[in-house]
Swiss-Prot record:
Keyword hit for Transmembrane: yes
Record's protein name: Protoheme IX farnesyltransferase
Species for this entry: Synechococcus sp. (strain CC9311)
Lineage, broadest ranks: Bacteria, Bacillati, Cyanobacteriota, Cyanophyceae, Synechococcales
HAMAP family: CyoE_CtaB
Pathway: Porphyrin-containing compound metabolism; heme O biosynthesis; heme O from protoheme: step 1/1
Superkingdom of the source species: Bacteria
């Protein structure tokens, strides 16, 4: 496979926006997708829509917890980042931000997140947010990432917790809808991340991180991506039943998203060494998850409920006609 792309070539927005060091270590570009899945978790409950104060506290607390996790991840990996050309210019390894300042920022964000979620939402949402933080830093970054090719499969639990936070914020408990979106994000994560790992495999190899493309090569990796891509598509259709209402609209609108994801997964599987295919899948997978969450929210609007009733009426008429003919 040709040499790895730089992260800037994969995510070109980094060339256009120079963040201050204290914000850079919080990894703010990852936060919007986490908040989108939080909203998706809310939309899957009977508690939707939330009051404005509760919504703001949930998203604000989630953003602070995610920022704290990003800072702690950077602190843990600063020596590793300093050994890679791609990451050596980051705030901590380059010396633009001191570790002590970063640690104080991480603790402050954690405490602020906990206070906001406990006071403005509920203890379950606060506890789940802190669980997500700990699982990202301890389970994924410290334990799994340097030890196994399946690091992102198990470690992906950290990124899948926000839907549970959203469901807990809306109702005070986690219903089946929240668990469905948790599972969807879990199976979405490997295909998304391994597409990026294909592009950055030389960096991971240089520092001894056993990502799947490094250990098994592109052929095995793209086959695994294909399996998880198919699992994501199949699982996504369960959202039709996971939604309290509006499932028919969601089921209709998810079709083009799944069609495009399937196309990109199959193209990469057919050309394991094609860097453009891997880059395209990585980028589309982000838009895909944003799209799923947007559809979940749209499906809870009043017009979607009407569409649901109309579809059910048509199905009842068709099924009644079929039974009449059959008899």
């Amino acid at each position: 496979m040709p040499p790895s792309l730089t992260r800037e070539e994969v995510v070109p927005s980094r060339k256009r926006i120079k963040l201050p060091p204290w914000l850079e270590v919080a990894k703010p570009r990852l936060i919007p997708l986490l908040l989108a899945t939080t909203l998706g978790g809310m939309a899957l409950t009977e508690g939707w829509p939330l009051s404005s104060p509760r919504l703001v506290c949930t998203l604000g607390g989630g953003a602070l917890a995610a920022a704290a996790a990003g800072v702690l991840n950077c602190l843990w990996e600063q020596e590793l980042d300093g050994r890679m050309l791609r990451t050596s210019g980051r705030a901590l390894p380059s010396g633009r931000l001191s570790p002590s300042a970063a640690f104080v920022g991480a603790v402050s964000c954690t405490l602020a997140a906990a206070a906001l979620l406990v006071s403005g939402v509920n203890c379950l949402a606060a506890g789940l947010s802190l669980l997500g933080l700990c699982s990202y830093v301890l389970l994924y970054t410290a334990l799994l990432k340097p030890r196994t090719t399946q690091n992102i499969v198990v470690g992906g639990v950290a990124g899948a917790i926000p839907p549970l936070v959203g469901a807990a914020a809306a109702t005070g408990h986690i219903g089946l809808g929240g668990w469905w979106l948790f599972a969807l994000v879990m199976v979405w994560t490997p295909a998304h991340f391994w597409a990026l790992a294909l592009l950055l495999h030389d960096d991971y190899r240089a520092v001894g991180i056993p990502m799947l493309p490094v250990v098994k090569g592109p052929l095995v990796t793209t086959r695994a991506i294909r399996r998880y891509g198919w699992a994501t598509i199949l699982l996504s259709f369960l959202g039709i039943w996971a939604l309290p209402e509006g499932g028919a609209l969601y089921g209709l609108l998810i079709l083009p998203f799944n069609g495009r994801l399937l196309q990109m997964v199959e193209r990469l599987a057919a050309e394991p060494n094609n860097r453009d295919r891997a880059k395209g899948l990585f980028r589309w997978s982000i838009l895909y998850l944003f799209g799923v969450c947007l559809l979940l929210v749209m499906s809870r609007m009043s017009g979607a409920a009407q569409f649901d009733l109309q579809v059910r009426a048509v199905v009842d008429i068709l099924s009644g006609g079929f039974l009449t003919v059959a008899s």
